[in-house]
């Protein structure tokens, strides 16, 4: 099904059908003289929208906030949360407007404008997003999708000359995000903290019925009842979150702001702010300049996710009195994360299966990379060339070339232990298929931002083409797979957007 126009989309408003306390209905505040910088045909196909529709005047009007989505009900949602480990109280969509929910060929997608003006939840904010951060978010979601990591998606990027004050005066933009749902851990925390169990139950029922209907069915040996459905939902959220963290860690991705209000109830990567894909590897790499204590450093992300899950579990305690049952569900996190992470790392190292004694091999590689500031992405990518008998490129990434070669010889010996079918070329090809050559490095995003400021979306097009299939080498694109230039070291990203 491909709709010729926005008016032909099948629009639902399931979140708007919740009681009024869950949101505020309001219209966006349109940008002045908006211009469509980019529209994503792949994301549009998810809602059955044709390429021609993306070039229509109506498309620009809807996704610049000038008119509502046909059939939609625009609103901003309320939620609360912990920010940097501290209870922040009520938060909510301070600059995001949910336009509606569209039925696509393979499922429903909510469409949300980010940067579309103030809402009752803006607190001290101005409701706007700047071009810089909007380009970064637009690219990041598509990059993560290309890596096979669950994420929200990007549909459109609209820009304007409207001034926005941050550290300096910047210009405004609106990025349209797509997700099956924007419900967060903080959505549950909100009602729990306010001691409103009826609203908490309504939210839980909405999430279970719409996204986890299988949780209504007792598993073998379980007694039926509402507590069981909630526990099964929590178990599924725990599984998805653990597997998401394994995906982040395996590609060297740092989110930067893992507050509970930025954690998706569907296990998606949500809210791309001061994120980063690591260049020089540090176990304790901090991508967010605002994170002075390193709470959200790369090596802390899995434990922070569990901490956040405990906040979600604590919110559900108002509905599930059995604390031990909640704890038992959350205790499954570490096993799930470890298994998922090892599966990913086994594939990256060219191992057919992970063994318990492979842990020192991986730990020693990460420590060696840390000590030598070796590039994360290229280290894993060049392992395949070493398997092909060309270890020099791998060694070039390390100050201690001999140590790098010695470690690789340990990996080669481990490969040899796998016995029959130990074909080097086939193994190397398998490694190339999971170790990306292209990731959204900060300097590549910065180049796209600079071009976008001049009204040129060419770099966005180029990056999207590479990032959608990041493991496949493209001719003439060596610069996009190279080590970052010296000037990239001066790029700082923070919570200011």
UniProtKB/Swiss-Prot annotation:
Domain of life: Bacteria
Signal peptide: none
Catalytic activity: L-seryl-[protein] + ATP = 3-O-(5'-adenylyl)-L-seryl-[protein] + diphosphate; L-threonyl-[protein] + ATP = 3-O-(5'-adenylyl)-L-threonyl-[protein] + diphosphate; L-tyrosyl-[protein] + ATP = O-(5'-adenylyl)-L-tyrosyl-[protein] + diphosphate; L-histidyl-[protein] + UTP = N(tele)-(5'-uridylyl)-L-histidyl-[protein] + diphosphate
Cofactor: Mg(2+); Mn(2+)
Active site: 261
InterPro entries the record matches: SelO
Binding-site residues for ATP, renumbered to this chain: 92, 94-95, 114, 126-127, 177, 184, 271
Protein name: Protein nucleotidyltransferase YdiU
Native species: Bordetella petrii (strain ATCC BAA-461 / DSM 12804 / CCUG 43448)
Designated gene of the protein: ydiU
């Amino acid at each position: 099904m491909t709709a010729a126009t926005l008016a032909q989309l099948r629009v639902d408003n399931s979140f708007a059908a919740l009681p009024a306390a869950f949101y505020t209905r309001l219209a966006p505040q349109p940008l002045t003289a908006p211009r469509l910088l980019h529209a994503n045909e792949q994301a549009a196909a998810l809602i059955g929208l044709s390429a021609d529709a993306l070039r229509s005047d109506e498309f620009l009007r809807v996704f610049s906030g000038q008119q509502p989505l046909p059939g939609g009900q625009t609103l901003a949602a309320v939620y609360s949360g912990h920010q940097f480990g501290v209870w922040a109280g009520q938060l909510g969509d301070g600059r995001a407007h949910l336009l509606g929910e569209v039925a696509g060929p393979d499922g429903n997608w909510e469409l949300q404008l980010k940067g579309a003006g103030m809402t009752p939840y803006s607190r001290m904010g101005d409701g706007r997003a700047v071009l810089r951060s909007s380009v970064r978010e637009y690219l990041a979601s598509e990059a993560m999708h290309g890596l096979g990591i669950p994420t929200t998606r990007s549909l459109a990027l609209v820009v304007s000359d409207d001034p926005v004050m941050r550290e300096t005066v910047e210009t405004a933009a609106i990025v349209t995000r797509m997700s099956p749902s924007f419900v967060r851990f903080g959505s549950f925390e909100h009602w729990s903290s306010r001691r409103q169990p009826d609203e908490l139950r309504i939210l839980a029922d909405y999430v279970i019925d719409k996204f986890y209907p299988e949780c209504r069915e007792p598993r073998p040996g379980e007694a039926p009842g509402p507590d069981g459905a909630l526990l099964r939902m929590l178990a599924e959220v725990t599984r998805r979150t653990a597997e998401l963290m394994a995906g982040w860690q395996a590609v060297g991705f740092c989110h930067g702001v893992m507050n509970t209000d930025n954690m998706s109830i569907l296990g998606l990567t949500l809210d791309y702010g001061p994120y980063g894909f690591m260049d020089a590897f540090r176990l304790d790499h901090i991508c967010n300049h605002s994170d002075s204590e390193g709470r959200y450093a790369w090596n802390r992300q899995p434990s922070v996710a569990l901490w956040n899950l405990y906040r979600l579990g604590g919110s559900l305690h108002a509905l599930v009195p059995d604390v031990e049952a909640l704890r038992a569900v959350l205790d499954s996190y570490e096993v799930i994360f470890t298994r998922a992470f090892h599966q990913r790392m086994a594939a990256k190292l060219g191992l057919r299966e992970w063994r318990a004694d492979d842990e020192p091999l991986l730990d020693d590689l990460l420590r060696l990379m840390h000590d030598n500031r070796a590039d994360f992405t290229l280290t894993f990518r060049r392992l395949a060339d070493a398997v092909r008998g060309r270890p020099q490129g791998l060694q070039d990434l390390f100050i201690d070339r001999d140590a790098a070669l010695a470690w690789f010889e340990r990996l080669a010996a481990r490969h040899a232990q796998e016995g029959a079918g130990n074909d080097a070329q086939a193994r190397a090809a398998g490694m190339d298929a999971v170790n990306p050559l292209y990731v959204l490095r900060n300097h590549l995003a910065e180049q796209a931002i600079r071009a976008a400021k001049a009204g040129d979306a060419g770099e966005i097009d180029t990056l999207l083409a590479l990032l959608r299939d990041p493991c496949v080498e493209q001719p003439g694109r060596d610069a996009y797979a190279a080590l970052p230039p010296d000037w990239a070291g001066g790029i700082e990203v923070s919570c200011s957007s």
